[in-house]
Amino acid sequence: MCLCVNLGFHKVKSNKPVALVTKQSILVYKVLSSTDGVHYYTPFVLKSINFDDEYGMFFYKTTRFSFDKEYLSKRNYKHLVVKGAHSYVNLARANYDKIFFEILSGSTTTTHIHYAIIPKGSKFYIGNDCDIASSNLVVFENETKYNENKDYFGDEPIEFSDYLKKFGTELDNK
């Protein structure tokens, strides 16, 4: 999965977009596939996801983002984030890609949408397709585990649309 950086939200420095830093935890959605409803993995990359037994959480920690070679397509995308924890900022887009992944994978797998949090202080990039790539991401096994543990990081996570209303695009993040 690649994220096409939305340059309306990011400064460009040394020909690369500058990551933003979360000022509050953000609620996002992660699409995962499963063959048995117990063992999950990410579509495309096939990274195995093992939820913690007690809290029902899985922690992504990425120290660096990686960018694909610069290219221009019909939609004029210039910067692609390849490495990073990818997720969606709303359920509608997550559901759209869930259906897409199910069609691609055939009848042997099922695809699920999971609640996830980008913790406060994480770096992130906003994409052109309601997607986001972050340096840290906590994925929850189910909605119950999310509701039980969403304040684990010390602040109440907010929807991305509310985050933008509250903080704008404050591009002074370094």
For each predicted feature, which ranges?
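Conserved NAD+-utilizing ADP-ribose enzyme module
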Residues: 1-85, 91-174
